[in-house]
Each structure stands twice: as C-alpha cells, then as structure tokens.
C-alpha cells in the first residue's frame, strides 16, 4: 500500500492541521470495502479527526481523502499506516466476497429475504458486514436468530456496547448471566432475547454467541445495530444470510 501526501496546511487560528492523501493502489476485490475501515480507524484512534471526502477511484484502486485534526501530519500518516488492510482482506475473502460483485449478490439476497419474510419463516438473520444498505421498505415480521463471531480481544468482559449512535437505555442480559449485551432502542424498537448459548472455538480463539430475539424487527434495524459494532471492530459476522436464505 502506498500513501502519497497531496497537500497539507496549518491554521494558526484554531491550531488545526489538514492534509489530503492518496491511499493505494489497494488489492483488487477489497479496495471498495475499505472506505468505512479508513474512517472508523481514524475516528477510533483520534475522535477529533475530521475525515472528509473519502473518494474511491475504481480505475487505479485507490482512495483520496482529506483529514483535519489538531494532531500533526506525521500522526495522521502513522494512523493510516496502522490500518490492518490484511485483516480486511482475509475477512472479506473468508465471506466469499473476494473478487465478487457484493452489491449484486446482496440485492439477490434481499429478494430471497423479502420472500421468506412474507412467508413468515423463522430463520437466522446473518448479515453481510460490508453491505449495510438494506432498503427501509423491506420489512420482516419474523424473529431473528443472529449468529455472531467475536474475537477474544474485542469481546472484553463479555459485553457488547452498541453505543451513542442510538441513545442510552435498555440494558439486555443473557439468561445464563455469564455475559450481557447492552443495546439501545432504534426508532422505538426494543430487542428482547429469549434464548441464548455460548461456545468457544479453540482453533480460531473465538467465542460463538447465538441468541433469538423476541421482538419483530425490520432488517434495516438489525443492520443499524450490527453496523455500529462492525465499524468499531467489536463484532465480526462469519456468515451472511446463509442459513436464513437456504
């Protein structure tokens, strides 16, 4: 990966640095997936980063971005260099999205999901991490059983926090009380867990959670909940609508 600094400036009035960068070229098949990663890593490391205009150029698989912060230009560069692109590559490849057309694949899944929802079938609503674009108009009245794959490092204290994007109330605890999920209503929708179990995969050093929600949710609400975790690297989904659609 190459980083080319296109411009930089310093504003004495507000003590703010700004720089624009060209990031790439990136590996084929994952370049379009990394805009969220770039933004989320920068904002996680430095919440006061102003990350603007992340634009992808499909002709040469690179990104152009403009960043403003009170941190030095060197800090910005080091932060961008610290983004784990290999992690993203392995993740999407493992999900079968490498060198595929994920948007078209996702739209195909939506058609199947819409049919199953209309048939009121209960299945496992397992979502693609990178395609957080489900139209609001597609509704589902079936309970969701969501299977999540969580790394040990990001599963601190057996607690998820779906944070500030959605408000601050309504703690949810699993029945076995070994761990809890803190989540918050979205558009006045509460999630109530009625079944749960936990297992540990020694090979991947990962914890597998499964739980069933009692509330009727729209797919867009589930995606909003999970996308916050995904973009903050608290949660990695290992399947995508697979059993829900089969």
Curated annotation (Swiss-Prot):
One of its GO terms (biological process) is DNA-templated transcription. The keyword Nucleotidyltransferase applies. One of its GO terms (cellular component) is mitochondrion. It is found in: Plastid. InterPro entries: RBP11-like, RNApol_insert_sf. Keywords: DNA-directed RNA polymerase, Nucleotidyltransferase, Plastid, Transcription, Transferase. Belongs to the RNA polymerase alpha chain family. This is DNA-directed RNA polymerase subunit alpha. It comes from Helicosporidium sp. subsp. Simulium jonesii. The gene is rpoA.
